[in-house]
């Protein structure tokens, strides 16, 4: 099938994916290829290159801080899925600057083409006071230096780029990876001998299975209009005491509450996140793209043993 043919699956394109060997990226590569796209996967290491090749994508060696390389890679594609990011909390400012430079390089190539540019963001911290965050909410730039990059990306619609921002739930779960916040919670529970939650544990976390998240990425590339914000959220909010309870049940550990002033001591850096009340909706995303999550829930994945805490 020739590239750019219009089929029942959408417009077949060459898509550059950064973070192609990562937790969400690798699943997204699989979904994009299944939809008929030709994927060029950015790989920094030999290990990443082998994984990208195994997924069926064309390997492009490079790094996120090699701007000339990113520009050249994007020039070989008709769209970009930018999922790669340095999540080192000790260098948040530098990571956001690197991210911005990469997005600007992609924008330079895609400007005036109408090609898609999808970048990743998050739902955490969108709404103060525990209200349910929607796609229409605008995040406060003070929450994270990365926030401004999302705004810049959406504004690229005015330059002829089909730009979109996918805000992922803070918990992107699934089998085969033991990744993310829940994996850290399970490790802490095993180390401490107790699965804990903060206070009453009624604060809620949204979640999405990685396969459902990847399907959303594919649908967005195929169908999302320019300047669109999407929420990769399958479950609006799971009470943190239920998350702790599921971890405790699987690990056969007691489940206990701890006071908020002990959260940092018990959970270390994760305490500030696990104490957040941050439910998020994806109603508008589902209506726009016809996205319907079908994969196991977070509690089902914990019960299935995907987070052994090792």
Question: Where on the chain are the PLM-derived regions?
Answer:
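Glycine/proline-rich active-site loop of Rossmann-fold NAD(P)-dependent oxidoreductases
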Residues: 147, 173-183, 191-192, 219-230, ...
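N-terminal Rossmann NAD(P)H-binding glycine-rich loop of SDR-like oxidoreductase domains
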Residues: 15-35
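Conserved Rossmann-fold NAD(P)-dependent oxidoreductase catalytic core, especially the SDR/UDP-sugar
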Residues: 38-40, 86, 98-144, 164
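Amphipathic terminal alpha-helices
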Residues: 296-310
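Mid/C-terminal beta-alpha module of Rossmann-like enzyme folds, strongest
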Residues: 11-14, 195, 214-270, 277, ...
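A conserved pocket-lining segment of Rossmann-fold NAD(P)-dependent short-chain dehydrogenase/reductase
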Residues: 187-208
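Conserved beta-loop-beta element that borders a ligand/cofactor-binding pocket
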Residues: 151-175
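NAD(P)H-binding glycine-rich loop region in Rossmannoid oxidoreductase-like domains
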Residues: 41-104, 108
């Amino acid at each position: 099938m020739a590239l750019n043919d219009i089929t029942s699956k959408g417009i077949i394109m060459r898509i550059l994916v950064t973070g192609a060997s990562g937790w969400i990226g690798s699943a997204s590569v699989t979904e994009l290829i299944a939809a008929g796209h030709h994927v060029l996967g950015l790989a920094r290491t030999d290990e990443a290159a082998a994984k990208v090749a195994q997924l069926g994508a064309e390997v492009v060696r490079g790094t996120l801080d090699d701007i000339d390389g990113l520009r050249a890679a994007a020039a070989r594609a008709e769209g970009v899925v930018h999922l790669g990011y340095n999540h080192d909390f000790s260098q948040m400012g530098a990571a956001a600057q690197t991210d911005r430079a990469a997005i600007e390089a992609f924008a330079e190539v895609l400007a005036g083409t109408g090609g898609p540019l999808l970048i990743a963001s998050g739902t955490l911290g969108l709404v103060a006071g525990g209200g349910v965050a929607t796609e229409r909410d605008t995040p406060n730039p003070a929450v994270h230096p990365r926030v401004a990059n999302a705004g810049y990306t959406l504004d690229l619609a005015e330059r002829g780029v089909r730009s979109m921002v996918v805000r992922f739930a803070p918990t992107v779960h699934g089998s085969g990876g033991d990744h993310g916040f829940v994996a850290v919670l399970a490790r802490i529970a095993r180390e401490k001998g107790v699965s804990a939650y903060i206070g009453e544990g009624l604060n809620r976390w949204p979640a999405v299975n990685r396969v459902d998240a990847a399907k959303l990425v594919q649908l967005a590339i195929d169908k999302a209009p320019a300047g669109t914000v999407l929420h990769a959220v399958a479950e609006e909010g799971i009470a943190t005491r239920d998350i702790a309870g599921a971890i405790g049940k699987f690990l056969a550990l007691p489940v206990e509450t701890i006071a908020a002033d002990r959260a940092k001591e018990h959970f270390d850096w994760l305490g500030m996140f696990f104490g957040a009340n941050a439910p998020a909706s994806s109603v508008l995303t589902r209506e726009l793209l016809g996205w319907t999550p079908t994969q196991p829930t977070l509690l089902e994945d914990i019960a299935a043993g995907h987070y052994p805490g090792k």
